[in-house]
Amino acid sequence: MSGGLVTAAYIVAAILFIFSLAGLSKHETSRQGNNFGIAGMAIALIATIFGPDTGNVGWILLAMVIGGAIGIRLAKKVEMTEMPELVAILHSFVGLAAVLVGFNSYLHHDAGMAPILVNIHLTEVFLGIFIGAVTFTGSVVAFGKLCGKISSKPLMLPNRHKMNLAALVVSFLLLIVFVRTDSVGLQVLALLIMTAIALVFGWHLVASIGGADMPVVVSMLNSYSGWAAAAAGFMLSNDLLIVTGALVGSSGAILSYIMCKAMNRSFISVIAGGFGTDGSSTGDDQEVGEHREITAEETAELLKNSHSVIITPGYGMAVAQAQYPVAEITEKLRARGINVRFGIHPVAGRLPGHMNVLLAEAKVPYDIVLEMDEINDDFADTDTVLVIGANDTVNPAAQDDPKSPIAGMPVLEVWKAQNVIVFKRSMNTGYAGVQNPLFFKENTHMLFGDAKASVDAILKAL
């Protein structure tokens, strides 16, 4: 395949990737967007494999077969509830790939390049390895937090921001040494020291972020992985990799910014680490009143006598796989003429759009799934609210307690409804480790047990 044909294929693939992003932005066109992405990636792979600069095609095809087999295995094995962990670990692979490409590019650069081109190449290598290493360890820590292997509580080291700044300054000085020196030994030493600093830097950035803010972390790491891919594209002189990486990097950054705005948080604090950890309260498990319990049968009667119902799902619904019976309850209540809607918090679940994906999977009509800003004013006129597996996103302490770790975060104001039913396994705190005063309000009743079992019991009673 000639160079011109490869370039043309790359342009087509890049356009398909843009169409893919546009399609994925809406529920109605998401399947079409996914197909555009698959087509673009297929064209990109074929053009790269059979391009004029590619050798050892057999090894590449073998690697593709192995990678494809692993991907198919994961796609069949991983549940929807484990998708955040899968996304995080895939981000780490992108970062690790950028690191390996960087070292390979340094060891096998073209001899006889002009000095200015050599400096540009070395800068590309250095930045590519730095971004890749930060993405790799940051994503591994995010994976550990999401699957419970690492504590979700933020790592609060003294002077952590000064440590982050020092790491950046030292890395910048190492970049100058790496580019300016002619000594191969000194270059390798600078590269290895920077890699070690970047690995620790990435680990510390994510470790210092509170568990409740993991959806923002996932979108932030998505952005980092995009820039790591773009850096690899520069090192490999691959235009499509640069374009694709820039698309992923910018879209991830925009998504992080939108989510931060929705949570009343500073975008810079996400980049710097320590997001959502400024509150002095530790959020202990101490109860702040007496809670009231309710049965599934009583909940069913309450729903039958309601005119308006809002369901606010959280990660607990995902874990229990309760979206299917919830969809059936919605269908039954709507058949009775009851106005049923869903209120989705921007960071409900463990990755952006987590609840929307689960509800779409259960075929809940998309026009009754509303964002927090669209539905918050309606709670006061609502008869019954079902809080299924949500905790921090419906916590009134965000508004009432300035010392709370989640202070200032906009929440779904479910307590304004006439009746609130909270589905929980126990009275334990949520992912942020903060007690929820909602559970002790007079209009709130607790329905304890597995969310799916509770929803099934309500469905049977209906």
Curated annotation (Swiss-Prot):
GO biological process entries: NADPH regeneration; proton export across plasma membrane
Residue stretches spanning the membrane: 4-24, 46-66, 83-103, 116-136, 165-185, 189-209, 216-236, 240-260, 309-329
Gene3D superfamilies assigned: TPP-binding domain (3.40.50.1220)
Catalytic activity: NAD(+) + NADPH + H(+)(in) = NADH + NADP(+) + H(+)(out)
EC number annotated for this UniProt entry: 7.1.1.1
Keyword presence, NADP: yes
Enzyme class, broadest EC rank: translocase
UniProt-annotated location(s): Cell inner membrane
Matches recorded under Pfam families: PNTB
Membrane-side (Cytoplasmic) residue stretches: 25-45, 104-115, 186-188, 237-239, 330-462
Domain of life: Bacteria
Molecular function terms from GO: NADP binding; proton-translocating NAD(P)+ transhydrogenase activity
Alphabetized UniProt keyword annotations: Cell inner membrane, Cell membrane, Membrane, NAD, NADP, Translocase, Transmembrane, Transmembrane helix
Periplasmic side: 1-3, 67-82, 137-164, 210-215, 261-308
Listed SUPFAM superfamilies: DHS-like NAD/FAD-binding domain
Topology versus the membrane: Multi-pass membrane protein
Listed GO CC annotations: plasma membrane
Family, per entry: Belongs to the PNT beta subunit family.
Record's subunit section: Heterodimer of an alpha and a beta chain.
Function of the molecule: The transhydrogenation between NADH and NADP is coupled to respiration and ATP hydrolysis and functions as a proton pump across the membrane.
Name by which UniProt lists this protein: NAD(P) transhydrogenase subunit beta
Organism: Escherichia coli (strain K12)
